[in-house]
Structure formats: structure tokens, C-alpha cells
Amino acid sequence: MDKDVPVSVWPEWELIEKIGEGSFGKVYKAKRTERGRSFYSAIKIISIPASKGELDSVRSEMNNEQSTREYFRNLVEDCIQEIYTMEHFCGNSHVVSFEDFKVVEYLDEIGWDISIRMEYLTSFMDYCTGKELTEKEVIKLGCDLAMALIYCRKLNIIHRDVKPENIFVSRFGDFKLGDFGIAREQAHTMSNMSKKGTYSYMAPEIYKGEKYDSSIDIYSLGIVLYKLMNQNRLPFLSLDKQLITYRDKETALARRMAGEKMPAPVNASASFSHIILKACAYEPGKRYRKPEDMLRDLEKLRLAPVNAEKEWEKSQWELTNSAELERDQRRYAPQKPEDCMERTHVAEDPQIEKAVREEEA
């Protein structure tokens, strides 16, 4: 085990290695062994304050030690809010599942460690390493995360940090939304807020400090899909340059925040481009107003090849059966009287037939 990996607050769970960092914390892979079988979880540890430097900085601004302690205690309550948010989603197949948590307060100093145990998943960044996602896979990702946002909306929760680093993949290939570290109930976030979140996927109204609603998560999801279908480049970044500079990123961000019309992502079909560009429209009123609406269009696109095949099979069936029906109609159509008489004569006794011919002569 890595010597820098801390000891778990759950004796039965051993922390093996650090696998990432999220909002205000580090994430570790943990293992529990029972009856010869190994089970795995992800444990996120949030330390408040994050460092001695942060503690000293706050101390210098506060009047006394009690005020300093209360300041950091409020941060602890904010982090516990993330835990309560995750509890709402227990059993949801498109949100990272919460399993348990513990809060430990230091005895000899101002500080807390918050441990959150969650299901162990593959990070989206690792999932994408060494391969390029097909449009079909990206559409599925869009569908899965749109379903996650539907549950957020039902609970009046805005995630505010939808980005590849907060997307995870289950062993069944389902995409999940995680890290609700800056999520807040919508009732408390409708007015101007701090610019928490990632600029690369941030909606313009947050960037400009304006009022916003849950459509900002739809915008961020749209930018995620855009990048995946645009050779892993954000809007307005050159597709020809191998090396993208900091200035390139700043210029691209400025153009996006100014409302310049985005070009279509180069690897997306026309139908998928329409969905993506609508999701990340500059004006909130021109976006999908609800994740349900975006999911509906994504599902139509996802099923389009299947529906087209079904329509082709139906048309072939109709053509085949139409031809067979026409043959049957010709075969069993009513006959002319003279045809019937002629067939009757042929079927008569030869002697009678001879007599009839002689009589006609």
C-alpha cells in the first residue's frame, strides 16, 4: 500500500491507492475481504481546512479562535450537504451510489475529516484512454446523463459542474454523474452566486454572474457532447493545431461567452449536431428547457437506425405479400362461362364428346 494513503475510518475497508481528486477532496480505492472474496468501494476524504496555510490565513482575518472554528464548521456543514444530496439518489442507475459516511473532528486542532464511501466505478477519463468513442456511444452517454439530470430536476437540484471528470462508467457500460460537491438545492441558487464550476463547460449566465436555472446543466452536457464529437476540442479551438496554448483557450472561451455562433462539431451527424447546438445555445430561452426534452430527441436519434430497419422490413413484407395476393387473385378469379363449358366438355366421356362434335357439324 502507498505510504501516503491514509488509514480508513472503517476498519473492514483498506485504502489501496489514490484514484482521483474531486471537489475539496481526494478519492481512494478501498478493498474489503470476506470469506476469500474481495469487494471494492471508492472512499472520498475531505479535510477541512485543506491545509495549515488555509487555517493560518483564516485565523489572521478572524477576531478570535472561536470565530475561526465557526468559519470552518460552516464549511463542514456545506460538505455534509453534498452527502445529503447523494442520499436522494440512492438506487438511481445514472448517479453514483452513496453507501456510507463518517465525520471525525480533530481533538488538538481546528479541523475535520469527512469520509464518504461510494460505489467503485471507472472514471470516464480512464474509460476513454486509448480509444475514440463512436457517435452511438456518445449518444448513449447523452441519454444516461440526461436521465440523471431529470432526477436532479425533480429534486430541485442543480449540479453546476457537469464535466468529463465528474462522469463515471459502471461495469455494465452505463454512464453515471457524480461529485455533487458544488450542487445546491435550486431554491438557494436562483440568484447571483460565486463562479464555482469549470469554465470550459460553464454556461454564459454563470460566467457573467447572472441569474440562472437548471438549464445550465443542459448547457454543460451539451459542451461535453460537443467536445467528444469535435476531435476532443472545445468550441472555437483549432482542429489543425496539434498544440493548444493557454491563449488559444482564453480566446475560445471569450468567443463562446460573447455569444458567437458555434460551428457544428465536425464528427457529428447533422441530426446529432442539431441536438448538441440546441443544448448549448447561448440564450437560455433557445436551449432545451427540460432534460426530458433533450432525452426525447436523443432517444429518437439513438433508435433511428432500428426504426429505419423496421420500416424497411415492413415495406419488404408488404411488397412480398402484395405480389402473393395478386397471384392468388389471378389463380382463384371467377371464370367466364364459355371457359367453364369448354373445360366441362373436355372432362366428359369421349363418346359423348364425339357425338357433340358430330351434331355441331
Residue ranges of predicted features:
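Short beta-strand micro-motifs within the conserved protein kinase catalytic domain, predominantly
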Residues: S97-W112
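Activation segment signature within eukaryotic-like protein kinase domains
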Residues: L141-G142
